[in-house]
Amino acid sequence: MVMKHFFILCILTLLFSGTVSEGLAMEKEVLLKFENGDVIYRIEDTVVIDFLDKRDVLSSSLFNGGWRNDLQAVLNHHPAKEQEAMTVEGYFANMNRLCKKLGYDAGKVSTMGTGVPMKNIAIKQAAYEGIRVTAVVTAGAEGNPGRVGDKAVYNAIAKEKLPRPGTINIMLYFNCDMPPGILARALVTATEAKTAALQELILGSRYSSGLAT
């Protein structure tokens, strides 16, 4: 069997509000190398998973999200001015600039943004009978936690500015062949796991009396 490498990119709360830093010092810090040649690296305040070949990616990102098999990379970015709000159009423009600055085709990178500095990123692996899952996570839930069912605080149709950052960004990397339906189920499981972790922290929503999800 030809082993494919699958990837899930999950934005589990809000998008960031901020701008791309100008003049990135293009020094890459390799965080993890996979046996197939893919690499996780950090450059300034961005963490990138660079794909050596085609990978099947399922992403909830607004920027090149959905089901893709033509991406060059996926990334998680912490902006230099995280308190400066912007519209979705501004977010897209900033992500386009960032991708090009990093040397990628902006149409072939799926991105996330967060108020969490990339020095705080966590990378963990778990394996079972040859199947390995790598989780690459940033969590800034204390800044702006919400709960499913809370009143929406952002209206894209009205072109409002994005709210204060409050993200839990999860990137999951699988080293095995997975049917599309199972990959979608894995995204649901990741969401449930994130909710369980928040419940263990007894972290309340900023917008209601319930626990954050």
Task: List the predicted regions and their residue ranges.
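Positively charged n-region of N-terminal signal peptides that target proteins for export
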Residues: 1-6
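Intrinsically disordered, low-complexity segments enriched in glycine/proline and serine/threonine
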Residues: 7-8, 25
